[in-house]
Amino acid sequence: MTRTVMCRKYKEELPGLERAPYPGAKGEDIFNHVSQKAWADWQKHQTLLINERRLNMMNAEDRKFLQTEMDKFLSGEEYAQAEGYVPPEK
């Protein structure tokens, strides 16, 4: 049976992650309060931010920005958008 969590972002019971995505307390918090759907949505958004804002993951400021935006995104707060991105038409 799939483990479910009360997703902090979507405010409903959804399938949880199979393992913590980070070590330590932050990873445990994400594991216990973020659904697979929210995490997958974050990974897509993270890729957009890295590409559109030309973030360098070797740069500590860029990593800190991304970490802050992840916290906002997963908490359902207002978060940074990828400027200039136009989603493909369906």
Swiss-Prot record:
What superkingdom heads the lineage?
Answer: Bacteria
Q: What's a single GO BP term from this record?
A: cellular response to oxidative stress
What Pfam family does this protein match (any one)? Iron_traffic
Q: Does the keyword Iron apply?
A: yes
Q: Where is the signal peptide?
A: none
Instruction: Indicate yes or no for the key word NADP.
Output: no
Q: Which UniProt keywords apply?
A: Iron
One GO molecular function term?
A: iron ion binding
Q: Which GO terms describe its cellular component?
A: cytosol
What InterPro entries does the database record attribute to this sequence?
Fe_traffick_prot_YggX, Fe_traffick_prot_YggX_sf
Annotated function: Could be a mediator in iron transactions between iron acquisition and iron-requiring processes, such as synthesis and/or repair of Fe-S clusters in biosynthetic enzymes.
The entry's family comment says: Belongs to the Fe(2+)-trafficking protein family.
Looking up NCBIfam families in the UniProt record yields: PRK05408.1
Q: Which HAMAP family match?
A: Fe_traffic_YggX
Xref: PANTHER family: FE(2+)-TRAFFICKING PROTEIN-RELATED (PTHR36965:SF1)
Q: What is this protein called?
A: Probable Fe(2+)-trafficking protein
Q: Which organism is it from?
A: Pseudomonas syringae pv. tomato (strain ATCC BAA-871 / DC3000)
Organism lineage string: Bacteria, Pseudomonadati, Pseudomonadota, Gammaproteobacteria, Pseudomonadales
